[in-house]
Amino acid sequence: MSSHADSKPWTVPALAQAKREGRKLVMLTAYDAGFARTFDANGVDLILVGDSLGMVVQGHDSTLPVTTADMVYHTASVARALDRALLVADLSFQADATPERALDAATQLLQAGAEMVKIEGAGHKLEVIRYLVEREIPVCSHLGLTPQSVLRFGGYKVQGRGEAGEQLRRDAQAVVDAGASLLVLECVPTPIATQISAELSVPTIGIGAGPGCDGQVLVMHDMLGLDSGHRRPKFVKDFLAEGGSVAGAVRAYAQAVRDGSFPDAEHAYAA
């Protein structure tokens, strides 16, 4: 279990404290109360209600069809089950197109029980991040492979190799300067993700970004080895096979993140 007291709910300042103390953060996605309750009781520090629900719950080929109403419904379902994990919810595709639209969507998510909202990308999103933070809404940034940009990327590909790694470093610092309290790095080569994590004052959460991040996140279906109807990424590991039950799988995943055994080189990308 986490060294963060079991009875003490996670807060945004506690995340930064964990980074300063070198304690790895454990994050999983959840979309309903039943799984969220199990994750919360078995060592997960942060729950992400991701727009990945479009693929693993609704059966779409991407996250693009997910709406703010979808996100609010699933966020409220998860929030009712949590005692200690901090709840992060995605802003859906184009909900953050303007600061005003982002504020409306973020307000709905916080009213549904989220404690932080996640925004993909940098660039014009920096204005959105600043706008929300100035209005007391905590923000998690998401860089690297950002699924809402899948059409521009031409598929789900590793990001940040070569010269693109330097731009990723600049973007990471920029989102923190704009006020982000947490940063998800997805499908980023281990060396650049490790460097970014060392340079930033806020925690980084990796998904396919190697062991040098300050924590890890997986889509719950991937962590449990469930067939989501999509190709399994390299960084995915089936913890249900060794855990023997859903609760056991969650504990095995949490322990592996905390002791540094996951992800290993087999579940990460080289430079």
Curated annotation (Swiss-Prot):
Annotated binding of 3-methyl-2-oxobutanoate, by residue: D51, S52, D90, K118
Primary location recorded for the protein, binned into one broad class: cytoplasm
Alphabetical GO CC annotations of the entry are: cytoplasm
Q: What is its EC number?
A: 2.1.2.11
Q: Which UniProt keywords apply?
A: Cytoplasm, Magnesium, Metal-binding, Pantothenate biosynthesis, Transferase
Residues the entry annotates as binding Mg(2+): D51, D90, E120
Q: Where in the cell is it found?
A: Cytoplasm
Cofactors demanded by this protein = Mg(2+)
- Disulfide-bonded cysteine pairs: these are none
UniProt entry tagged with the keyword Magnesium: yes
Q: How is the cofactor bound?
A: Binds 1 Mg(2+) ion per subunit.
Q: Name one GO molecular function term.
A: magnesium ion binding
Domain of life of the organism encoding this protein = Bacteria
Q: GO annotations under biological process?
A: pantothenate biosynthetic process
Query: Which pathway is it part of?
Result: Cofactor biosynthesis; (R)-pantothenate biosynthesis; (R)-pantoate from 3-methyl-2-oxobutanoate: step 1/2
* PANTHER family on file: 3-METHYL-2-OXOBUTANOATE HYDROXYMETHYLTRANSFERASE (PTHR20881:SF0)
How it assembles, according to the record, is: Homodecamer; pentamer of dimers.
**Name of the protein in its database record:** 3-methyl-2-oxobutanoate hydroxymethyltransferase
What species is this protein from?
Xanthomonas axonopodis pv. citri (strain 306)
